[in-house]
């Protein structure tokens, strides 16, 4: 991509696709469009109606940097610094698990199990035109265990205005990023980030007080971790991936405490490895949970365990 050449969007896009193909990118066209969109501020559709527009020097410099990073295998989400998650956009950063679309199903299943009232029925318009939440909307107390970027905690709080979420993680990098996302999304009054080894940072007087504990813990079996694609193994922290021999090490550890911190009838929803949901089902039943079910992810694989504390 020489500086003295005229580079239109189409020419730069074609060059980027070819470069990424040679670097072994599995989806070079998708990657090229994503990078071009980030560099120009145009949507992927807008790129195609602006094929003949020349790139500015600044856009070319940004694109050149992005393409070089992608050529080294850096995930697109880290290059752009953000990722959409359900109805929000969250910041991402190195050494923190990148949110995946599959995890959106975890939030959907948790909401479905709780059978919450329609938020729209409890929203009124204030004197200055602002939205006002009715005090009749039931409060929802939530723990997001292994919060990572905070995508789950922030998503729940943004979608349900009466939710108060405690977001827990042990990794300093994750805690810092989660706090940034809470502030960026204006959720500081309803999402509290705490450093914690599993549920250890919850207070004794909080036992029996939570409606929902939701978690995307490290759940990849160790042997599977060793064979993960480079884009995952080199950029997502091992701490956020490796769940031990069968992927259930942390799940087994926090089950008893989850039972004690939930209200009677409270919900536990956990994303887990597709091959070991049956074992997780048995673990939950043995720990005293009931009404346990398994939900599939977007690809039809078993992914989420949902269960309840007895009433």
Regions found by a protein language model. Give the residues of each.
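C-terminal beta-strand of the catalytic ATP-binding
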Residues: 219, 308-311
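Conserved AdoMet
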Residues: 34-113
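Mobile active-site "lid"/loop adjacent to the S-adenosyl-L-methionine
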Residues: 219-250
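Conserved SAM/SAH cofactor-binding pocket of Class I
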Residues: 105-227
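Residue-level signal for inorganic ion chemistry
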Residues: 35, 73, 103, 152, ...
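Class I S-adenosylmethionine-dependent transferase superfamily signal
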Residues: 110, 156, 232, 254-258
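Non-catalytic accessory regions of SAM-dependent methyltransferases
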Residues: 1-47, 53-55
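Conserved Class I SAM-dependent methyltransferase catalytic core
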Residues: 245-308
